[in-house]
């Protein structure tokens, strides 16, 4: 793919270390591309990673995750997005595991990862761990991903109730993460409806995003302390701007802020990009055609006028009649002066809105 200078979705992101005085082991990245020189379809990849491991090793794992996944996706042809994402997470997990055995201080390090890849208006995702992906559409907030934790498995099997799960001592035991000694199988399910089978959820890959849809990726430092309904209220009131995200961070910190907090939102433009481009091109073409026709008419009129003026066809002349014996003075004819041609200025051509060209916007905080 070809790096682009701007993303085709509006991006907002915040990250905070929390209130416990620990270093920030969360990382996020956003990178924008076009598919190829012959195919200008825009692509945007967003990643949130939450590192785990002592001696700052979690930072290393999370940093490796966002950098390696971003690079592997950027080097792809985007022909099979689900396979590319799955392989990128698996390869990154292997590299983190290998790195952890080169340095004793990094043994056991790992990281979660939540990835959202939007190609045009199609969404593809892959996750591992308990970092989440949400969809805000038509005033409703839908969690698209499933946590890979001991507690979530207990909930799925009816061993715990939601109330019991909230404060359970195993609440943060992660069952799937990048950096494990076992090969990673990324979770490719996109859950749009209650009761969907795993196969149905995976079939939602490539779902079409609608104008105004918003995606939210976050680490568990937010969702451990802030309810989904509160996230919805904040985004609905403030359109997912940095101010709304900072408000959610402040709310989590006010309730203890026991972990790093990272939130990233992606918002689809109000109208489909391709439709706006086609409309703009039609307008520009109409202006150009209309201007060309008007210019041709003016040039033709000017040419005809010049010929007539040159030949005297429209000009009257001052006549000097032959003197007659009985004339006291010559008679002067009144010249006919043609009216000046008025030129109508050409309408200015409307500029064609540029589709942002995009260099990598990857951010690691």
Segment roles from a protein language model:
Residues 1-364:
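PP2C/PPM-type serine/threonine phosphatase catalytic domain
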């Amino acid at each position: 793919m070809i790096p682009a200078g701007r993303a085709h979705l509006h991006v907002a992101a915040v990250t905070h270390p929390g209130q416990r005085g620990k270093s920030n082991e969360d990382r996020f990245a956003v990178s924008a591309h076009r598919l190829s020189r012959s195919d200008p379809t825009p692509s945007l990849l967003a990643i949130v990673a939450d590192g785990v491991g002592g001696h700052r090793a979690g930072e290393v794992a999370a940093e490796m995750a966002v950098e390696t996944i971003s690079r592997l996706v950027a080097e792809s042809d985007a022909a099979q997005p689900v396979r590319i994402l799955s392989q990128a997470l698996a390869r990154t997990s292997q590299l983190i595991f290998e790195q952890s055995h080169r340095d004793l201080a990094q043994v056991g390090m790992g990281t979660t990862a939540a990835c959202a890849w939007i190609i045009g208006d199609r969404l593809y995702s892959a996750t591992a761990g308990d970092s989440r992906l949400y969809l805000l559409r038509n005033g409703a907030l839908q969690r698209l991903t499933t946590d890979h934790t001991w507690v979530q498995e207990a909930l799925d099997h009816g061993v715990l109730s939601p109330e019991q799960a909230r404060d359970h001592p195993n609440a943060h035991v992660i069952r799937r993460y990048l950096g494990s000694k076992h090969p990673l199988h990324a979770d490719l399910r996109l859950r749009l409806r209650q009761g969907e089978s795993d196969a149905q959820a995976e079939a939602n890959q490539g779902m079409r995003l609608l104008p105004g849809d918003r995606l939210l990726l976050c680490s568990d430092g937010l969702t451990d302390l802030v309810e989904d309904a509160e996230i919805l209220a904040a985004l609905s009131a403030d359109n997912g701007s940095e101010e709304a995200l900072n408000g959610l961070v402040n709310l989590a910190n006010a309730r203890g802020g026991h972990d790093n907090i990272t939130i990233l939102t992606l918002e689809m433009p109000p109208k489909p990009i391709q439709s706006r481009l086609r409309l703009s091109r039609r307008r520009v073409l109409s202006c150009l055609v209309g201007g060309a026709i008007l210019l041709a008419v003016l040039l033709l009129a000017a040419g005809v006028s010049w010929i007539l003026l040159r030949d005297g066809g429209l000009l009257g002349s001052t006549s000097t009649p032959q003197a007659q014996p009985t004339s006291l003075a010559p008679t002067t004819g009144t010249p006919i002066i043609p009216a000046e041609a008025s030129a109508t200025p050409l309408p200015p051509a409307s500029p064609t809105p540029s589709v942002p060209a995009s260099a990598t916007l990857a951010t690691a905080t």
